[in-house]
Each structure stands twice: as structure tokens, then as C-alpha cells.
Amino acid sequence: MAYKIRKINRNVERRDYTKVSMNLSLPNLIGIQTETFEWFKTKGIQEVLDEFFPILSFDGSSVLTLENWGFKEPRLSVRQAREESKIYDAPIYANLKLSVNKTEEIQKEFDGVDQEDTLKVLTHWLEEKTGNGNITFKQQSQNSYFFEITIKKSEKPDLIQIDIIEDKKTSLICNVSIYKSGEVFLGDFPLMTEAGTFIINGSQKVIVSQLVRSPGAYFNKELNRKTGEMIYFADIIPSRGTWLEYETDSKKIGSDAINPLYVKIDKSRKTTATSLLLAFGISKDDILNIFDNDEVLVETLQQDSIIGDFKIDWSNQVQEIYKKIRQGETATSEGASKFINSILFDKRKYDLTKAGRFKLKQKLSIKNRILNKVIAEDILDANNNVLIAKDTEVTKNNIQEISKILDQDVMSIDLKYLSDIPGNRKVQKIRVYKDSELKTDTTCLIGLTNSSNEEFITVADILSTVSYLLNLKYNIGEIDDIDNLGNRRVRTVGELLQNQFRMGLNRIDKNVKEKLATSDLYKVKTSTIINAKPLTAIIGEFFNLSQLSQFMDQINPLSELTNKRRLTALGPGGLSRDRAGLEVRDVHPSHYGRICPIETPEGPNIGLINNLSTYARVNEYGFITTPYRKVINGIIQNDQVEYLTADQEKNFIIAQSNVNQDENGKILDEIIVSRFNGDDYMAKVEEIHYIDVSPKQIVSVATSGIPFLENDDANRALMGANMQRQAVPLIKPESPIVATGIEFEAARDSGEAIVAKEDAIVKYVDSKTIITDGESGIRTYILSDYERSNNGTSLTQSPIVKVGDVVKKGEIIADGPSMDQGELAIGQNVVVAFSTYNGYNFEDAIVMSERIVIDDRFTSIHIDEYTLEVRNTKQGQEEVTREIPNMSEQAKRHLDAEGIVAIGTEVKVGDVLVGKVTPKGQVQLSPEDKLLHAIFGEKSRNVKDNSLRVPNGGEGIVQSIKRFKAKSALNPDGIELPADIIEVIKVYVVQKRKIQEGDKMSGRHGNKGIISRILPIEDMPHLEDGTPVDIILNPQGVPSRMNIGQILEIHLGMAAKKLNQKVITPVFEGLNEKELEEIMAEAGMTNYGKVTLIDGQTGEPFDKPIAVGVMYMLKLSHMVDDKIHARNVGPYSLITQQPLGGKAQNGGQRFGEMEVWALEAYGAAHTLREILTIKSDDIKGRSKTYEAIVRSKRIPEPGIPESFNVLSKEIMGLGFNMYMIDETGEKSAINAYDKKDFEIDNYDDEILIKTDNLYIDDQDVDAEFEDLTYVDENDILNSFELDNEEE
């Protein structure tokens, strides 16, 4: 039997056709979010605080130290933050201690104080100095006096110690030490929810991880086409700080030519590499000794003006380098040296990070450069014992042992340079033969010792880099591939937040130093020394404005999960879309098991936005690792799983997971397809080091949800993976008959399901709560009920356990949207026939049966949120009311007494949801008006209707209303709102959308299409047994697209449906052809799954048998209700006066260049003229035409389009005068509209321009026709020079 029955959970079991039995269970799929944020909270913040504290004042007399810090409880719960549109955050507090040390001269002459009574003198002086009378003397020890100053009973008292140094006749010379401590607020910090998201202003946001170039040393070479010489390059790149770029010169030509070595410091002008070493205080002789008189360095030193006096040489080189970096500036030798040291060796300015140090040690240590080389000297230990003999060749077999010896820092030499340069002062030096065959000439390798751990650059790093570069021409070392994942690292949420926190503290650090310098330290409070605003501002800016902080894609659980696992190469410090070439976008061999080669966007971001593979993890240095099982002597060690980076992997031979093996893990094949150093390799069993853990480890979660992925063309699989994320949650979710086995894990880790937090027994279940009893006691889970997602879909959770069930930790106890019994269910299983139907499925269109609509198979629920703010304006307070001027009772029929729509009301476009009036400027009332006002009250008030109405396409049923009133003395239970807002009202309107013509659907194989026709059930073709077909797809959509997976899916789906089974066929290891034939035979299917279909309209059978089966189809979020749009009169662009575009702007359809060609081809001159003038931007013409139509008059002649005026003004701007000449040769004016034709009335933030000289005052304009334009206030004020009256 080729399958086994697998129990997915308590409710679901499937036939599992998995071939590789040793599949590793998947890691936590959102671990890249939750684990790194946990690191940030526990270690990341501490690291940054350790960098900045203690803070010293400029003069060194005061020091601010950090005693401890921590988060306090969040002020709001996650649910409250979402409902009130707030941030889910927690305050950070730190306990700080300020120590001040000062020398003071204290005068003895105080009125009424005995000069001999020192204690009284000191107490009196302290009272004056601190302005505080609560001073308590604690004790005296010889000449030291100890005092306590109480500020508040709730706070710790300040301690002051006064040591008398000298007792003069009229004064005391004292050393005063002040110790203040207190709790300081460092700001509110957003917290991550359990689902890996942040709640920012009520919306769920995700911080996307960024894939960037790792700090480290990189080497390259290229041919100079002019001279034919090879140029070698080396870059030392930090995470933050100065770049060092080395390159060899190529001016001298010939086999004997030796070119010098140059360096650029931070993109400045070139200087010789040796001048930098001389500037560090390494003498010329030491340089030559370290490098064994290397010919390139000898040549380079000749470029430096060296006279032999160390001090003078050092001074000249330091100043020379300073001039190159700071062009046009001069400095003393000491100043220049200090500057160079500060930009390279100061931790604050130069940050290599742990990852950078790891990469430098990996690249520049000798053990990684000597493979396939012959050692040219005995390698000795400290006692001169030979560890590795001369002439030993380093091979794959002995490299591990030699590496262990070199790790003991043998053959290291001490470096002599300036004492004020920090860092490791040892390098390793070993000689090897330039040519392993001839063994004549030797070259020395300088490498880092194992003890180098600094997170800044050291002189040892610079010497090792120079050595590496000099030896590249002897093929010692290798050129770097920048696109290799060993050279790119992931900045996860934790690191990105840590960087922001560091920037915030950097600003606080500057402010604190200024405060310590300017404040009276006797009176200052610890709690006021730090102002947290710079930190909270930077954090807020990051969450609200950063390219990496994204509004979470929440169409369905899969899109949410994918968003959290996304990697982007864009963003600050990354690439830009325009500059990224093909190489960086391409699939690289090192992506295997780390980044999915299939799931990436189509379009300008292709290859720049990627997704983590299923098993991939990010290690402590930010490099992506993937798991492999160890293989020893041809036997797979199932219990030894190792996570390797791309760099570690390249030295091993790795087999694919689908090898033949026995029950003990012994590999049965003799020759195995494997990978070595990024290439395919046919290996013998005994050569294998590792084996993949699973065939699906190379693809992402979404891609591994495509059954028969191996039978689909990659382009279509890419579309399939992307479209699964766009599937709308349906009201009756149905898990796929043909699944891949990832559905349970994807649903569990998405954050939308409710997962048991511990082993427990279910005590109570209803539609809103589940109560369990476990080790930690009674636990209540609250379920969401018709909550709105970020994308307007409905988030509803439904329980799948019953009272008395025993649940395990990590088990799904309530389904979220698009889930069925704990499995991801983003579509429906429908009967599909591949046949044409009267041309209705031309070009991928889909013909559907009405039965699907009636049964609500593809019906989805969508919730729209409409918000109304009640403000306090200059004219007075806005008001929510039912009394709205000039509104009929019919229009107000849905409003209650307060002016708010009732829950459950069915509303249409234009209906009022909330009535609101805004006061206009109050005018002096005449006696008659006052009388009317007294009689009728509200109705005659001078107010404007500003009600909230249902926009186009927003009809539905009012589901809920939320009101948030501002916190005030009268309303202490209110919430914090901006100063001018009194109340916020949110109305939620729910729509039930059945599937209809124009909606987009797809399968999981990139087979997408638009519904073109929904046929009555009786007209649909049906099988001979009467089973009606649900969907007809065009068979021509398969061969050229090469997504054959869909054909295999319909056959397997049909067979499984007939057998009443559900199946699992994982990617790359699912059913093969033979097994598919077996299950089809078991289900009684013949003729390769093709059947005779009967035409529903004629009752006749079709001529040829047709492929019919069950396919999992998805309804995508591109629905015709959101796209359909019409316009009659609407807004116009301010400059060209042409109608705006797009549905959001209520714009028109563009009649573009190609459409103009069509009319030109027909010779339709009058139609064309009309379209280009009165239907577009002939301002007067379009008003006159509207008037003519309304009054049934003749359509006037078109005038001059505004675009022509814009063009003529642009030509005038170039200095050409343009005018028109009539038939007689006379100049005539071009009729352009004049700004006098416009009156401007200021309406809040928008300005209404009304044309046709309509006069506007505070009263409503009574005009039969008017042309309205909504534009931005600033634009118009800039465009027309308005004086104050007009404005």
C-alpha cells in the first residue's frame, strides 16, 4: 500500500502519500517575528543601554548611571487598542543614579550662625544652595559630613557628603558629593501580540525583515581592458561607519610590472595603503618584515615620501591622510591622528556588529585560505614543538585537523603601533608556496587570531585584508559573490527596533550632557534629567512611516502568515527598485532551503521581495540557515539535525531527501544526486556528509500548498502561490480534498486560529467563549465575531471542540476565517469540466453553474468601516443631531432620535449614517430673524450639513456602531482623543457578496480567469449519472501554460471524492503516475478520467469524452463590485483642468493616445474634437454645453482646451511669444479663461471653485448648473495670488 492513514486532528483523517518518512516537524512559522522581538525585549534594549550608560558630563564632574530598567504593564489590552484605534504599548521605566563631585568654597559669615559651629554653617549653606529646608544631618566621620535631603515622601531622599579639605579663617574649602536617584520614564514602546503583529492606531502592522549586505571584508577582481592588467579590489564594510576600499593600480604594463596598492577612506581620494599603516605608527621596516618584503608593498612605499625619521614620517602621513578625507582643511599631527582613530576605532562611530566580526574572522583567518596549498614552513607551538611539518599539503581530508591546530593561535606575531589605538595586537603568520607543484617561491599569509572579538575594526584586520589582497594573484583565497546568502544577512524585527532605540538614546545622550552642563545640579531632579520625547518620536516615526512597517495583508490566514515571513531587499540601507540589476533578483544556488525560488511578486519588485522557505531559520548573526541530517558512512543519523548557513554548506556534499533507504537509515543507492559548492554532483554513498530533511524545504509555505507543484511550470506556480494569498474567506469554508499536508501548520501559526496554550479539559463552549481547565487553572478564550480585518474581510472564529474534550498544547480549538476543522480552507472543491462552451470561456473566462450561487459556495462577507469625527471648530462646536437643514424626513428615515443609524438597517448609496451639523460663521441677526430663531429654534440656525453618508458601492446592513467620547472632567470614563475632537463615531456596514459575472477566480496552479457567464442549472452539461458540472474551464488554457498539475489534481480529486476520502500529496514527494492510476481504478474511473458529458440544453451527449474532475477553486479579492465605476460630473485636475482618473477620485475613463488613433482611423473629426474639448478641458465650453443640454438648446462650438493654454504658457516660459493670427493676418487674443471667472469660498480643508461667475456669499448658491472642483487648499493658494480678502 503506497499510503498510510494520517490523523490530522480529532476531526480529520486523510490518506497520506508522503514518501520521505523522516520529515522533520516544521518550526514555529512566525518565530522570525516573535523570537526576535523577545530577544529585543530581554537583551537588545540592555545592549543599547550598556553602550550609553554611564553618561558623563562634559567636564567629567557628574555621572549618570543606570541601576535597572523594565517594562510595566500595558495600559490597554490588545482588544481595547484595536477598538479605540490606539497603540498596544507598555511604558519603559529606568532607575537612574546621578553622582556629582564638586569643589566648593563655603563662606562662614552667616547672620546668626556661630562660625565655629561647622555643622550649622554647612546646613545653612545647603539650605541656600538647594532651596530646600528638609535637610537632615545623618552622621560625621572625621572631616566628612553626611546629609539627607527629602524632596517628597514617596521619593528616595538625596544624599550629600561634604569633605572639608581646608579650614580657612573666613571659609571652608570642601569637596561636595551629591547622590540623587529616582525612576525615569523612557517612553511607551509598542508591544508585539502573540500573533507576531503590532497594533498601531488600531490597525495590525507587521515589521518585515530586511535582507541586506552583511558587514565584513569583500574581495573582487576585474580586467582593465586598456592595459590588460588584472585589478584587485578589497572593501571592508561596517554596519555603521567608515568604509575602507583597497585597489591595485594598473598603469604599469608588462609581465614584470609591479603596481602599487591604494586605499580610499570613506569614498575620499586615493592614498597609498602603506601611508595608512605608517599613520597607525607602524614603521617602514616593520611593514616590510611583517609582509616578508612583498614587492607590491616595496613599490607602494616608494610612492610615500619617507625620509627615515619615524616621527617626521608619521607626522607627514597622518596629515596627508587627513587632507584627503577632509579636503581643504588642515590640522596638527596629533589632531589628525585623533580624527583618524576616532572614525575607525571608536565604538560609537564605527560598528562592525557581531555578524561583521564573525564574517571577518571567517574570511581573514588563515585556515580558510590554505585549502589545496602546501605549507612552506614547520608550524610550531609555544614550546617550538612541530605541530604541522613543512611541505604538508592541505586537502579536504586533513583541513579539519589543521584548522583545530591553527585555532590555538600558533605562529602569531605581536604588532607594534600607536598605544592609543585599541584592539587585538596579534596576527597569525604562515608561509605557503605560491605554486604547489613547483614549491620554489613562498608567500606569507597574515591572518586574524582566534581571540579577535572586537566589534570595531583593528589594525590586525587591516593587515590581514592587505595580505589577502596581495595573495589573490597567486590564487590564494577567493573572490566573493555578493549575491550568495553567506554574504547577505537578515535584519529581523528585533535588530531593526534595536537600531531605532539606539538612535533615540543617541539624541537623549546629547540632551542629558547639555542639561548636566547647564542645570543647577543641587536643585535638579533625576526624573527631569531625561526627556523621553526624542526616543518616542523616533519609535513612532518608525512604526508609522518606515518602509519596513507594513499594514498587514489580512485577506486570509495564509496572506497574514506570508507577510510575517517576508524578506525584502528594499528599504533604508537596502537596494532601490530602479538600481537593482538582474543578478540580485535572480535565484541563487545558496537560496536552496533558505529562500523560496518561486514565491515572489510579479512586476518591478520581482526577486527583491522574497519569502523564507518552510524550514529556514535565522541564526544569531542574521544569516539564514536550513536543516540537514548528518550522514555517517552512508547511514542517515535521524537524531542529528544541524542548521547550516550558505558558507558552511559549501564545503559539504549534501544528498537529496528522496534517496532509497532501509528502516535503519542506510542509503541503498550506490550513486546519489547531490550538491557540492552550489553545483550538482553525482556522489558515492561514502562521500555524503549531509542529507536534506524534507523535499519541501526548498519552497515557502504558500508554494508548498500547491499539489503536484513538480508538474507545473515555475511561472505559473509563482502565480498560484501569490493568488492563494488573495483568496477571500468564504462563509462556508471547505478544506481541499487534495491537500499537501501543510494546511494544519499554516492555520495554527497564522495567528487567526485559537490554539490551546496548555493541556486541558474543555469545560464550556459557546460561539463567543471557550473555557478550559488545565494545570494553570481555569483559562478563558474569547472568540472574534464579525470583526473587520485590515482588508475589509470578516474575522469570525468558531469552536471545533466540545465540552469534555481533552485538548493538547498547540492544538487548534477554534477555527479562524478560511479554516475548516483546524485546516486552512481558502476555497471550495467543485466539479470542473475542461471543455469549450459557445465561446463563453474564450481567453481563460469561466462558465459557472447557478447552483454554486444558490448554495452560497463562494459567498463572502465584507465589512466596511465609516468614521465620523465631531470637532470643536472656530465657529463653534459640531453636533450629532437628527435636525439637519434642508433634509427631508424620507432621507432621515434610518436615523434615531440622536441622529445615528439603527443597527440592522439596510442602507443604500447616499443614505445618511450619522447626521452632523457644523456651525457657519455667525452673522448679526435682524429682529425678524431673531423672532424666527426664538420660535423655530434649531431649524433656522446658521449651520451646514456635514453628515456621514454611504459612499458608492458601500450599500449593506449596519452591523455595529462604536462611539468614543473624549476624556474630560465631565466624562472621566472617556478615551484620549486629539485636542479638537469631541467624539468619534464608527459605523460598520456588512455586505454579503455572492459570486457574480466579473469576479476573478483561480485554482492553485496559476490558472486564473474571470466569470463570464452564470448558467441556469438545467443548461449546464452533466454526467451520465445526472451529476451536474459546477464550472467549465477552457482546455486551451493548459498546454501553453504547462501547468499540468491541475489535470492531475482533478483526476485525484474525483477519485478521492468517489471514495469519500481526503488525501495528502506533498510537493516533490506525492503521488506518482502509478499510484494515481491505482486510486482512479479503485474509484472505478476509466478512460484516464475522461467521461461522456450530456449537453443540458439539447440532452445530446457531446461528441468526444471530456476530462471532468474535482478542483479546489478560489474566489480572489478582485471583485467586480469594487472595480465597477461610472462618472457624470466630478473633480478636475487643477492645472490641466482635465477630469481626474481612478475610482477613488470619482474620476473618468482616460481617452488616451491609442483611442485617439482609432477615431482618426475612422476619420471621425467632429467626435474627436468634441472629446478633446467640451468633454474634457474646454472650461467655458463644457459649462455652456451642460446648459445647452439642460435647456434643450443647440450645442455650442468648442472653445480652446485648457491644455493648450498650459502648453502656450510653458512655451512663453522658454522665451517664445505666442499669439494667434486670424484670416486677415491680424493678431487676435487667445480666448483663455481668466481667474476672475472664479470665486473662492473656504470650506474647512477643501476649497470649492465654482465657475461661470456664480456669486458666492454665506448663503447657499442657487444655480441651475455649476462646475465643482475639489482641490487641495495649498495648491490653489499657490496657483492664484490671492490677497487677504479673497483668501
Swiss-Prot record:
InterPro entries named in the record: DNA-dir_RNA_pol_bsu_ext_1_sf, DNA-dir_RNA_pol_bsu_external_1, DNA-dir_RNA_pol_su2, DNA-dir_RNAP_su2_dom, DNA-dir_RNAP_su2_hyb_sf, RNA_pol_bsu_bac, RNA_pol_bsu_CS, RNA_pol_bsu_protrusion
Highest taxon above the source species: Bacteria
GO CC, one annotated term: DNA-directed RNA polymerase complex
Keywords per UniProt: DNA-directed RNA polymerase, Nucleotidyltransferase, Transcription, Transferase
A Pfam family of this chain: RNA_pol_Rpb2_3
PROSITE patterns: RNA_POL_BETA
SUPFAM superfamilies: beta and beta-prime subunits of DNA dependent RNA-polymerase
GO molecular-function terms, A-Z: DNA binding; DNA-directed RNA polymerase activity; ribonucleoside binding
Subunit structure: The RNAP catalytic core consists of 2 alpha, 1 beta, 1 beta' and 1 omega subunit. When a sigma factor is associated with the core the holoenzyme is formed, which can initiate transcription.
Family: Belongs to the RNA polymerase beta chain family.
General function of this protein: DNA-dependent RNA polymerase catalyzes the transcription of DNA into RNA using the four ribonucleoside triphosphates as substrates.
Protein name, as recorded: DNA-directed RNA polymerase subunit beta
Protein encoded by which gene: rpoB
